[in-house]
Amino acid sequence: MVNQTHEFLLEMTGVSKEFPGVKALDKVNLNVRPHSIHALMGENGAGKSTLLKCLFGIYEKNEGNILFLGKEVNFTSSKEALESGVSMVHQELNQVKQCSVMDNIWLGRYPKKGFFVDHDKMYRDTKAIFAELDIDIDPKVKVATLSVSQMQMVEIAKAFSYDAKIVIMDEPTSSLTEKEVSHLFTIINKLKEKGCGVVYISHKMEEIFAICDEITILRDGQWVDTRPLKGLDMDQIIAMMVGRELTHRFPEKTNTPKDVILEVENLTALNQPSIQDVSFELKAGEILGVAGLVGSRRTDIVETIFGVRERSEGHIRLHGREMKNRDAHEAINNGFALVTEERRSTGIYGNLDITFNALVANVDEYKTQMGLLSDKKMKSDTQWVIDSMRVKTPSHQTHISSLSGGNQQKVIIGRWLLTQPEILMLDEPTRGIDVGAKFEIYQLILELAKKNKGIIIISSEMPELLGITDRILVMSNGRAAGIVNTKETSQNEILELASRYL
């Protein structure tokens, strides 16, 4: 598939990019070999996205050279890059959902028979690509009917159809099950066998060690190092990424659980399949983890408690008082807060500033007697969120979408703390966040527990649950399979419980 006359398929050398007042990239290098999977790592804000935008012509670089197959290139669009053999599978998949799979692959370059589209050839060509990549999807079904992992496979097949030499994958496993991740890795390895160079961007260290051959690390817009992965360990990579040694992945636990403040008894959601007969207690100052396989209905628990999912039976008691929580507004007034899993779609208002995003859950607090909003109080509370959550931002007016994932998440947590909750529920709070920012969010969570908040954390990352929680509620197929003390349990025990009702 790929002509191997060059040591590197892609050579980005000394690439710099400046924005007004900010040097986003400062002489960055990225060299990708054929037959290799190359990890590109760095904290959010390290410059990974900016570097790739310079490659695809979305940003114009200020200096540096880009060689592709030995020739200097300056792509002016993603389309030009794709047609030349450089493809990107995005975290947010850009597909025409109401069109068929094969339409999405051949869009804009349909095979023709006379004046008409040759659907038979399009079908045959799609089937041939799928067979080569071991993809089992009907080319004629609508993309809207596919799972996220299948949509990603369609994107990879599209890159393959363009005879891509470089395939860039941005956080490809963020929404996949373990089985789907395993299948994706098989397909990525097939691309490697055929001579492609795959650039793999992920915050998941385990994946980097499982699949990658080389690694390039960026920090604060600068190139730190490029090395073979063999011989490196996790601590060395983290130290290069953050510029200091993180001696522990998790802060020291200094919270002390006290009296029970929340009792959940026989909680069952109205619209099944969902949670059934779930019971647990939560103490003041306690961090309770919720574990389970994908599809175990972990999120349904916090949604039902928060009133966004209707319950058919069960009791929620806070300090012994029965809580109805018929909707989110009532739940907020009763002292509950929920940081949702999908930060981009249900957490932030991307085209609005930090002030709006920090205060939106608490607007009534800023109304004066005349019904106007108090600018002074709004400024003061926004500053409180920025200071107490340690948000890195130029100003209150900065659009939240321009912040790194870790800083966006801190603003969301700060937003809910302004409502003065007693129970804070966090669904996948560190998904898509780099290792340094994760540590800061763990610190914030522990500080809140020390202030006697009751905290519930849902996470798919087992080390996270074992590193930060006091107890873990394990869900299996919508039912509580057991509650374990974190200090006394193991990954194997949790996985056994998670399979109990399958």
Swiss-Prot record:
- Listed PANTHER family: CARBOHYDRATE TRANSPORT ATP-BINDING PROTEIN MG119-RELATED, GALACTOSE_METHYL GALACTOSIDE IMPORT ATP-BINDING PROTEIN MGLA
Xref: CDD domains: ABC_Carb_Monos_I, ABC_Carb_Monos_II
**What Pfam families does the entry give?**
ABC_tran
Keyword Translocase, does the record have it? Answer: yes
Enzyme class of the recorded protein, top EC level: translocase
Keyword presence, Cell inner membrane: yes
Recite the UniProt keywords alphabetically.
ATP-binding, Cell inner membrane, Cell membrane, Membrane, Nucleotide-binding, Repeat, Sugar transport, Translocase, Transport
Q: Which organism is it from?
A: Vibrio vulnificus (strain CMCP6)
Query: Main location per UniProt?
Result: membrane
Q: What does this protein do?
A: Part of the ABC transporter complex MglABC involved in galactose/methyl galactoside import. Responsible for energy coupling to the transport system.
ABC transporter domain residues are 10-245, 255-502
| Gene Ontology CC terms | plasma membrane
Name of protein:
Galactose/methyl galactoside import ATP-binding protein MglA
* Compartment(s) where it occurs, according to its Swiss-Prot or TrEMBL record: Cell inner membrane
Partners and quaternary state? The complex is composed of one ATP-binding protein (MglA), two transmembrane proteins (MglC) and a solute-binding protein (MglB).
Q: What is its EC number?
A: 7.5.2.11
Sites where the protein binds ATP: 42-49
State the similarity comment. Answer: Belongs to the ABC transporter superfamily. Galactose/methyl galactoside importer (TC 3.A.1.2.3) family.
* Highest taxon above the source species: Bacteria
